[in-house]
Amino acid sequence: MNTEATHDQNEALTTGARLRNAREQLGLSQQAVAERLCLKVSTVRDIEEDKAPADLASTFLRGYIRSYARLVHIPEEELLPGLEKQAPLRAAKVAPMQSFSLGKRRKKRDGWLMTFTWLVLFVVIGLSGAWWWQDHKAQQEEITTMADQSSAELNNNQSQSVPLDTSTTTDQAMATTPTSPVDTTATNTQTPAATTAPSPTVDSQQNAVVPPSQANVDTAATPAPAATTMPDGAAPLPTDQAGVTTPAADPNALVMNFTADCWLEVTDATGKKLFSGMQRKDGNLNLTGQAPYKLKIGAPAAVQIQYQGKPVDLSRFIRTNQVARLTLNAEQSPAQ
């Protein structure tokens, strides 16, 4: 009878109350139980008050209660009905797995994005290369055009130089013609063939055999302008004797030395082309004119320029490998 009453009384008590009563009967404190079970005192207190901590999984809570029951000598079978109420097993929340098709779509989208990125990169590189090639081709065409123009100008200058030489020879012959009548009237012993010879060479031979009196007449009869025309074999008078002084060096002189073949065009302030054409390696130019000078240089790296005794900086044209267009002012300040 007493056993049944005790059993009914134990069933009326909760799991926490039974564990607390058993601990008190053994004379153990909550601190001692916590140390033996390696738990916190707050966890032991929650178990005795039938509280389930929110941050503690039900599986761990059931294990703690069973360990506590073995410590205070309570059979686990008597606590199972209470455990089902106090710490029911809760299904673990498992995150739903993403569909394989979703991952496949994302991978496909990333592939399209990468393809578009590479396509844009290739287009940018292609446009940059096309722009560089067009600029390089335009420079080469410009250099070729300038070289052709300079060749045409040189050919025109050579074709025009022939009439100029003919007129100069004619002027020299006309300048020597008035001396023939004087020679004829001065001496009656001279032969007719000698009086009609027009060439300066025959005149010089006649002057070699004319008597001194006739030579004086020739000298007096020769006009002043004819005296300035000298035959090819005559030696020029010294500058001191002629009263002519050597001119001073031009401060605006432009000196250029070439280390490689280079096309060049130089124009002064009056628009006169001082030079236009191709200069070969190891060549040099010394030009004078009215400043400022305008220069076009096909290969800036192949020429060294000195203006007013100072070198001209062409490094910015050499770095970009472009045709140099610059103006040299009187203050020796090259401008683009």
Swiss-Prot record:
Compartments reported by the entry: Cell inner membrane
BP-aspect Gene Ontology terms: regulation of cell shape
Superkingdom as given in the UniProt entry: Bacteria
Chief site of localization: membrane
Bias (Low complexity): 165-201, 219-236
InterPro entries given in the database record: Bact_Cytoskel_RodZ, Cro/C1-type_HTH, Lambda_DNA-bd_dom_sf, RodZ, RodZ-like_C
Region (Disordered): 148-248
Domain (HTH cro/C1-type) ranges: 19-71
Entry keywords, A to Z: Cell inner membrane, Cell membrane, Cell shape, DNA-binding, Membrane, Signal-anchor, Transmembrane, Transmembrane helix
GO MF, any single term: DNA binding
Record SUPFAM superfamilies: lambda repressor-like DNA-binding domains
Parts of the chain on the Cytoplasmic side: 1-111
Known DNA-binding region: 30-49
Membrane topology (Periplasmic): 133-336
Protein's name in the database: Cytoskeleton protein RodZ
Lineage of the organism: Bacteria, Pseudomonadati, Pseudomonadota, Gammaproteobacteria, Enterobacterales
